[in-house]
């Protein structure tokens, strides 16, 4: 048996092998050590000849929970089942791996989030870029894209941040090169897969077998070879792990990420669109505020809308029109919600049908869902006015014949397992009805036999029973054994009774069990036939599921608009952004009605495209800037916005440089993280972007910080010309308002003695104080520290008013140098400043300053 295990394990070296032994899954050798540690189960051993074999095991009926724990940690699990009856086996029972479960191929509902796709991605490098294929095998979605040019990898990483796949496969030859960057995006499972799967020789046939001619992508992308390579490798991986053809994956949808607003990982994190920074949950995120979806399908679609804001004005206006239509009709919303409640997750049901794992209760859920489709269709056609809602209604296929099949074939209240019987409805199949009648008659005969035997023997406690090991029996207590007739044959002895069989009982047993065996086999065959017929209708079910998801997502936007008192934004084509009484959608909900202070925003293309925002900590600068970004994003997904009035131009990207933290794993300081984020902004932002920059330069010394912040502000204003909200504590920057297009705003406070009151109102003009000590007092720092802080502040302010004195340090011999001995000055002389960008100049200045500082430190130490 161990030899059999080792032969199978050799085929799946990168998976933990769950090896079926009776009622347990056993693991051996290194798999056992790993599973014992990760699952916290006892590590034992068994005799393996020359050495003791480490082993551990779990009950097969409890395997799902253990598998889920391993998958959540990024492991793969190969399920090895007994594929023949042990009673009929000659020698070792034949075993085969029936499925490999990986983070991206999980299908069981209890492993998954209902309202989140579980994506599996494949990346294929090529000479000028990358091909990408993405699937969610639980729903059948399969998407293909490609990235080329100098920014190909950066764009691909941004797309990975949006998709947040559970697993990514890449060519084995590229696993070291690409794996690190992908894992930095939080993708736990990044796996090298055999290179040949990405080659045209294997990938193209796999693609064409699943979808038809690969040439269908030729007209859509010049990089179709890379896209097909990624898609083909993904399909090969699925076939090798799932051991079946997935019929519900029937369409490869090519898409261009450039069709949507681009949001990099920093922006998604800083705006907390779908995951909170604090704990990674959806609590207190934008999604949590606007998600009023009723179905799991609608929830997944709404999440995708948030992560992919639109750029096409016509599409934005179509969603806004539909949202307005629903928001203005309370009865329509109420009826639609009521009907949607009865629609199950049709997308994932098609996955179960394709996998052959759908049970009878799943089919009853499908039947109930289909019964509501014509009602939803009629409701929208009759009451909706928006063109998008009409299109949705026309896309709903009622699938009447499918519902009629399920109504006729499947019992209305079936058991969960086929083994329990009773799944096929009475009247669907004559033979099923006949066998059930025979079984009932046999059991009625058993009841008559029991009565006759009690009368014949005089044993009133005599009873006829059944168990799976011994079959039917007559049980007699020990006190009555002397009354047992001679024709009773002993079958089993118990502590307080004995069990017998008679020729008549044996005849009834054969009749009943024969009927039950035939009935179970027939029900299984009929159920499989129903599943096969349903698998032929998967495409139609998916089409209706997509329409229902769209209706649900639009309902959610309308419900959020009504509950949040949102207004419909105008889409501006002149580039001007105007928000009246804008509010932060998440904080407003957290704080409760009427407590959030609204603020206005106006930005145009010339006079006020750059807002320089000052004010104390805790005053609300970051909240205000995020608020503007979220209002823009909501408008571009086709949602109403939290404002009295909003006029929003279409932005191609939103950038955020907010917060400060070290990247310890990446070996980057707070300041380096900040500068990397700034580099991305200045390299990738355009005139049509929205930039949010909060406290740039605070990760370094004051003068360095001021210099960098000022240079960045000037560069963004003059070179990029993007609409920008730029907050700072450096009051020296407020004179930037002398440049046309830069305006000063501050967050107002009111002073009362030594205390301040935050008014949370953004008003024109600059702030000349940071109120840091007052904020420290509010935070509860001891009075002794506060008082000492005030003394130090006064001393520093007085010193700032005196003329600067020469530093004695400059007279120290250790700091004297000759010009021809200073490499820094020589390097400065070689620089061509006119050919450098402001950011390059800043970075060079920073490095030269660092060299001088290190040199001075070394000389001082040598003294």
Swiss-Prot record:
One Pfam family linked to the record: MutS_IV
InterPro entries assigned to the protein according to its UniProt record, in alphabetical order: DNA_mismatch_repair_MutS (IPR005748), DNA_mismatch_repair_MutS-lik_N (IPR007695), DNA_mismatch_repair_MutS/MSH (IPR017261), DNA_mismatch_repair_MutS_C (IPR000432), DNA_mismatch_repair_MutS_clamp (IPR007861), DNA_mismatch_repair_MutS_core (IPR007696), DNA_mismatch_repair_MutS_N (IPR016151), DNA_mismatch_repair_MutS_sf (IPR036187)
Similarity remark: Belongs to the DNA mismatch repair MutS family.
Example GO molecular function: mismatched DNA binding
Sites where the protein binds ATP: 615-622
Single GO BP term: mismatch repair
Keyword ATP-binding found: yes
Name of the molecule in the record: DNA mismatch repair protein MutS
Function summary: This protein is involved in the repair of mismatches in DNA. It is possible that it carries out the mismatch recognition step. This protein has a weak ATPase activity.
One annotated Gene Ontology cellular component of this protein: cytosol
Gene designation: mutS
CDD domains in the record: ABC_MutS1
Key words of the record: ATP-binding, DNA damage, DNA repair, DNA-binding, Nucleotide-binding
């Amino acid at each position: 048996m161990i030899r059999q295990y080792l032969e199978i394990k050799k085929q799946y070296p990168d998976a933990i092998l769950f090896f079926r032994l009776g009622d347990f899954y056993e693991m051996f050798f290194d798999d056992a050590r790993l599973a014992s540690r990760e699952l916290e189960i006892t590590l034992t051993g068994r005799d393996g000849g020359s050495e003791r074999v480490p082993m551990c095991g779990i009950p097969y009926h409890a395997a799902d929970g253990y598998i889920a724990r391993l998958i959540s940690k990024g492991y793969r699990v190969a399920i090895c089942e007994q594929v023949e009856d042990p009673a009929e086996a000659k020698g070792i029972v034949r075993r085969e791996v029936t499925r490999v479960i990986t983070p991206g191929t999980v299908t069981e509902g209890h492993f998954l989030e209902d309202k989140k796709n579980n994506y599996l991605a494949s990346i294929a490098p090529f000479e000028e870029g990358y091909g990408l294929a993405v699937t969610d095998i639980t729903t059948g979605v399969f998407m293909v894209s490609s990235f080329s040019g100098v920014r190909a990898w950066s764009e691909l990483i941004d797309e990975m941040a949006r998709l947040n796949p559970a697993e990514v496969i890449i060519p084995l030859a590229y696993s070291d090169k690409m794996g690190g960057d992908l894992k930095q995006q939080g993708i736990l499972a990044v796996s090298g897969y055999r290179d040949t799967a990405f080659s045209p020789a294997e990938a193209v046939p796999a693609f064409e077998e699943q979808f038809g001619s690969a040439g269908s992508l030729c007209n859509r992308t010049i990089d179709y070879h890379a896209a097909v390579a990624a898609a083909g490798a993904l399909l090969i991986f699925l076939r090798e792990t799932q051991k079946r053809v997935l019929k519900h994956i029937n369409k490869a949808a090519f898409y261009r990420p450039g069709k949507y607003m681009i949001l990099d990982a920093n922006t998604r994190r800083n705006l907390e669109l779908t995951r909170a920074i604090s704990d990674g949950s959806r609590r207190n995120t934008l999604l949590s505020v606007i998600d009023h979806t009723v179905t799991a399908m609608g929830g997944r679609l709404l999440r995708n809308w948030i992560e992919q804001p639109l750029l096409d004005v016509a599409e934005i206006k179509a969603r806004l029109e539909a949202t307005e239509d629903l928001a203005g009709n309370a009865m329509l919303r109420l009826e639609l919600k009521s009907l949607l409640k009865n629609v199950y997750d049709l997308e994932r049901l098609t996955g179960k049908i394709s996998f052959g794992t759908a049970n009878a209760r799943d089919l009853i859920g499908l039947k109930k869902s289909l019964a509501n489709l014509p009602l939803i269709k009629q409701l929208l056609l009759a009451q909706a006015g928006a063109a998008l809602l009409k299109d949705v209604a026309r896309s709903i296929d009622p699938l009447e014949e499918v519902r009629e099949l399920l109504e006729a074939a499947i019992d209305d209240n079936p058991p969960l397992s086929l083994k329990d019987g009773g799944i096929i409805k009475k009247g669907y199949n004559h033979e099923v009805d006949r066998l059930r009648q025979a079984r009932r008659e046999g059991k009625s005969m058993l009841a008559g036999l029991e009565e006759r035997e009690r009368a014949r023997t005089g044993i009133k406690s005599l009873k006829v029973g059944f168990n799976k090991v011994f079959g039917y029996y007559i049980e007699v207590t020990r006190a009555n054994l002397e009354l047992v007739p001679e024709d009773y044959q002993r079958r089993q002895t118990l502590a307080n009774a004995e069990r017998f069989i008679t020729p008549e009982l044996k005849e009834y047993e054969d009749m009943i069990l024969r009927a039950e065996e035939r009935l179970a086999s027939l029900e299984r065959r009929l159920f499989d036939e129903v599943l096969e017929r349903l698998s032929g209708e998967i495409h139609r079910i998916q089409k209706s599921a997509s329409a229902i998801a769209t209706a649900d997502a639009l309902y959610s936007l309308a419900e959020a608009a009504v509950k949040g008192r949102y207004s419909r934004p105008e889409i501006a084509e002149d580039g001007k952004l105007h928000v009246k009484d804008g509010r932060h959608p998440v904080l407003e909900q957290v704080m409760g009605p009427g407590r959030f202070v609204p603020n206005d925003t106006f930005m145009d293309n010339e006079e006020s495209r750059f807002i320089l925002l000052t004010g104390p900590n805790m005053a609300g600068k970051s909240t205000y800037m995020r608020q503007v970004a979220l209002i823009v994003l909501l408008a571009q997904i086709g949602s109403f916005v939290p404002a009295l009035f909003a006029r929003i131009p279409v932005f191609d990207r939103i950038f955020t440089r907010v917060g400060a933290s070290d990247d310890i794993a990446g070996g980057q300081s707070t300041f380096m993280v900040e500068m990397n984020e700034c580099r991305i902004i200045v390299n990738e932002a355009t005139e049509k972007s929205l930039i949010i920059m909060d406290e740039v330069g605070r990760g370094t010394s004051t003068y360095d910080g001021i210099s960098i912040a000022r240079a960045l502000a000037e560069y963004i204003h003059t070179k990029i010309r993007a609409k920008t909200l730029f907050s700072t504590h450096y009051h020296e920057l407020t004179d930037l308002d002398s440049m046309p297009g830069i305006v000063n705003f501050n967050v107002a406070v009111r002073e009362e003695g030594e205390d301040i009151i935050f008014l949370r109102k953004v008003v024109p003009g600059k702030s000349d104080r940071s109120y840091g000590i007052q904020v420290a007092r509010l935070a509860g720092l001891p009075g002794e520290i506060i008082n000492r802080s005030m003394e130090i502040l006064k001393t520093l302010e007085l010193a700032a008013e005196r003329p600067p004195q020469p530093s004695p340090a400059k007279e120290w011999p250790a700091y004297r140098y000759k010009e021809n001995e200073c490499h820094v000055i020589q390097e400065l002389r070689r620089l061509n400043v006119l050919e450098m960008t402001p950011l390059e100049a800043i970075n060079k200045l920073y490095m030269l300053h660092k060299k001088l500082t290190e040199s001075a430190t070394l000389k001082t130490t040598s003294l």
